[in-house]
Amino acid sequence: MGKIYNSITELVGHTPIVEFKRLEEKLGLKGRIAGKLEYFNPAGSHKDRMALEIIEAAEKRGEISPDKTTLVEFTSGNTGVAMAAFAAAKGYKFKIGLQNGVSIERLKLLQAYQADIAEVPQELIAGVFEKGIAAFADVIEYMEKGVEHPFSTRQLDNPDNINAHYKHTGPEIWEDTDGKSTL
Protein backbone atom coordinates (compact mmCIF):
# COMPACT_ATOMS: atom_id res chain seq x y z
CA MET A 1 0.00 0.00 0.00
CA GLY A 2 3.00 2.32 -0.05
CA LYS A 3 4.22 4.53 2.74
CA ILE A 4 1.64 5.85 5.18
CA TYR A 5 2.78 8.59 7.53
CA ASN A 6 1.77 8.94 11.17
CA SER A 7 1.45 12.72 11.17
CA ILE A 8 1.66 15.76 8.92
CA THR A 9 4.73 16.71 10.96
CA GLU A 10 6.63 13.99 9.08
CA LEU A 11 5.90 15.69 5.76
CA VAL A 12 7.62 19.02 6.35
CA GLY A 13 10.58 19.72 4.11
CA HIS A 14 12.25 17.94 1.24
CA THR A 15 10.27 20.14 -1.13
CA PRO A 16 11.26 20.04 -4.80
CA ILE A 17 13.54 22.54 -6.49
CA VAL A 18 12.69 23.69 -10.02
CA GLU A 19 14.89 25.57 -12.47
CA PHE A 20 13.18 28.58 -14.04
CA LYS A 21 14.61 28.22 -17.56
CA ARG A 22 12.12 30.52 -19.26
CA LEU A 23 12.94 33.29 -16.80
CA GLU A 24 16.65 32.75 -17.40
CA GLU A 25 16.06 33.03 -21.15
CA LYS A 26 13.77 36.04 -20.87
CA LEU A 27 16.30 37.92 -18.75
CA GLY A 28 19.26 36.73 -20.83
CA LEU A 29 21.00 35.30 -17.81
CA LYS A 30 24.14 33.19 -17.99
CA GLY A 31 23.51 31.67 -14.58
CA ARG A 32 20.76 29.37 -13.43
CA ILE A 33 17.76 30.42 -11.30
CA ALA A 34 15.99 27.81 -9.24
CA GLY A 35 13.23 27.98 -6.67
CA LYS A 36 12.27 25.68 -3.82
CA LEU A 37 8.54 24.93 -4.01
CA GLU A 38 7.65 25.34 -0.35
CA TYR A 39 3.93 25.18 -1.02
CA PHE A 40 4.40 21.40 -1.05
CA ASN A 41 4.69 21.52 2.76
CA PRO A 42 1.54 20.24 4.53
CA ALA A 43 0.24 23.67 5.62
CA GLY A 44 1.31 25.21 2.32
CA SER A 45 4.32 27.46 2.89
CA HIS A 46 7.91 27.86 4.03
CA LYS A 47 6.50 28.89 7.43
CA ASP A 48 5.78 25.20 8.10
CA ARG A 49 9.47 24.63 8.74
CA MET A 50 9.86 27.27 11.41
CA ALA A 51 6.50 26.60 13.06
CA LEU A 52 7.37 22.94 13.53
CA GLU A 53 10.92 23.76 14.64
CA ILE A 54 9.69 26.24 17.26
CA ILE A 55 7.28 23.67 18.69
CA GLU A 56 9.67 20.71 18.60
CA ALA A 57 12.66 22.65 19.98
CA ALA A 58 10.54 23.88 22.90
CA GLU A 59 9.40 20.28 23.50
CA LYS A 60 13.01 19.06 23.55
CA ARG A 61 13.92 21.75 26.08
CA GLY A 62 10.99 20.62 28.25
CA GLU A 63 9.26 24.01 27.99
CA ILE A 64 5.97 22.72 26.60
CA SER A 65 3.79 19.62 26.46
CA PRO A 66 0.42 18.97 24.80
CA ASP A 67 -1.29 18.00 28.04
CA LYS A 68 -0.82 21.40 29.67
CA THR A 69 0.50 24.06 27.25
CA THR A 70 -1.46 26.48 25.08
CA LEU A 71 0.60 27.89 22.21
CA VAL A 72 0.03 31.62 21.61
CA GLU A 73 0.90 33.72 18.55
CA PHE A 74 -0.19 37.01 17.01
CA THR A 75 -0.16 36.70 13.23
CA SER A 76 -2.53 36.81 10.32
CA GLY A 77 -0.29 35.07 7.83
CA ASN A 78 1.06 31.68 6.93
CA THR A 79 2.77 31.33 10.30
CA GLY A 80 -0.64 31.19 11.95
CA VAL A 81 -1.87 28.50 9.59
CA ALA A 82 1.29 26.44 10.12
CA MET A 83 1.19 26.84 13.91
CA ALA A 84 -2.49 25.87 13.96
CA ALA A 85 -1.86 22.81 11.79
CA PHE A 86 1.04 21.49 13.87
CA ALA A 87 -0.57 22.38 17.19
CA ALA A 88 -3.58 20.30 16.13
CA ALA A 89 -1.38 17.45 14.88
CA LYS A 90 0.54 17.34 18.16
CA GLY A 91 -2.47 17.81 20.45
CA TYR A 92 -1.80 21.38 21.63
CA LYS A 93 -4.33 24.11 22.16
CA PHE A 94 -3.49 27.13 20.00
CA LYS A 95 -4.62 30.70 20.55
CA ILE A 96 -4.10 33.08 17.65
CA GLY A 97 -4.55 36.83 17.62
CA LEU A 98 -5.55 38.28 14.27
CA GLN A 99 -5.69 41.72 12.72
CA ASN A 100 -8.91 42.97 11.16
CA GLY A 101 -9.41 42.08 7.54
CA VAL A 102 -8.36 38.44 7.58
CA SER A 103 -10.11 36.56 4.79
CA ILE A 104 -13.05 34.31 5.57
CA GLU A 105 -11.12 31.42 3.99
CA ARG A 106 -8.23 31.90 6.42
CA LEU A 107 -10.63 32.10 9.37
CA LYS A 108 -12.36 28.88 8.29
CA LEU A 109 -9.00 27.14 7.89
CA LEU A 110 -7.87 28.22 11.37
CA GLN A 111 -11.20 27.07 12.80
CA ALA A 112 -10.80 23.70 11.07
CA TYR A 113 -7.49 23.33 12.93
CA GLN A 114 -9.35 24.09 16.20
CA ALA A 115 -7.50 27.38 16.75
CA ASP A 116 -8.90 29.71 19.41
CA ILE A 117 -9.22 32.97 17.49
CA ALA A 118 -8.72 35.99 19.73
CA GLU A 119 -9.81 39.50 18.94
CA VAL A 120 -7.01 41.91 19.76
CA PRO A 121 -7.95 45.54 20.52
CA GLN A 122 -7.04 47.93 17.73
CA GLU A 123 -5.03 50.16 20.07
CA LEU A 124 -2.68 47.26 20.83
CA ILE A 125 -2.28 46.50 17.14
CA ALA A 126 -1.68 50.19 16.41
CA GLY A 127 1.14 50.12 18.95
CA VAL A 128 2.91 47.46 16.91
CA PHE A 129 2.87 49.67 13.82
CA GLU A 130 4.03 52.70 15.82
CA LYS A 131 6.68 51.11 18.06
CA GLY A 132 7.72 48.06 16.10
CA ILE A 133 8.53 44.59 17.36
CA ALA A 134 8.87 45.67 21.00
CA ALA A 135 5.12 46.38 21.09
CA PHE A 136 4.36 42.71 20.39
CA ALA A 137 5.03 42.06 24.08
CA ASP A 138 1.88 44.04 24.94
CA VAL A 139 -0.17 42.06 22.42
CA ILE A 140 1.11 38.71 23.67
CA GLU A 141 0.58 39.73 27.30
CA TYR A 142 -3.03 40.61 26.44
CA MET A 143 -3.54 37.28 24.64
CA GLU A 144 -2.04 35.24 27.49
CA LYS A 145 -4.49 36.62 30.07
CA GLY A 146 -6.63 33.82 31.44
CA VAL A 147 -4.62 31.12 29.65
CA GLU A 148 -3.17 28.44 31.88
CA HIS A 149 0.41 27.57 30.89
CA PRO A 150 0.72 29.81 27.81
CA PHE A 151 3.77 29.57 25.55
CA SER A 152 4.31 32.43 23.16
CA THR A 153 5.89 31.09 19.98
CA ARG A 154 7.27 34.60 19.16
CA GLN A 155 8.01 33.98 15.50
CA LEU A 156 9.69 37.36 15.03
CA ASP A 157 12.38 36.99 17.69
CA ASN A 158 12.51 33.25 18.32
CA PRO A 159 15.94 31.86 17.35
CA ASP A 160 14.32 28.53 16.47
CA ASN A 161 12.75 30.31 13.49
CA ILE A 162 16.17 30.87 11.95
CA ASN A 163 17.48 27.51 13.15
CA ALA A 164 14.83 25.73 11.07
CA HIS A 165 16.50 26.97 7.92
CA TYR A 166 20.06 26.28 9.12
CA LYS A 167 19.08 22.74 10.13
CA HIS A 168 16.78 21.86 7.24
CA THR A 169 16.30 24.27 4.33
CA GLY A 170 19.99 25.01 3.75
CA PRO A 171 21.15 21.40 3.89
CA GLU A 172 18.28 20.35 1.60
CA ILE A 173 19.28 22.94 -1.01
CA TRP A 174 22.91 21.86 -0.75
CA GLU A 175 21.96 18.19 -1.12
CA ASP A 176 19.50 18.76 -3.98
CA THR A 177 22.07 20.79 -5.95
CA ASP A 178 24.90 18.33 -5.26
CA GLY A 179 26.73 21.07 -3.39
CA LYS A 180 26.78 23.37 -6.41
CA SER A 181 24.43 26.05 -5.14
CA THR A 182 25.72 29.61 -5.29
CA LEU A 183 24.24 32.88 -4.15
Where are these regions (language model features)?
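PLP-dependent amino-acid enzyme catalytic core
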Residues: M1-L183
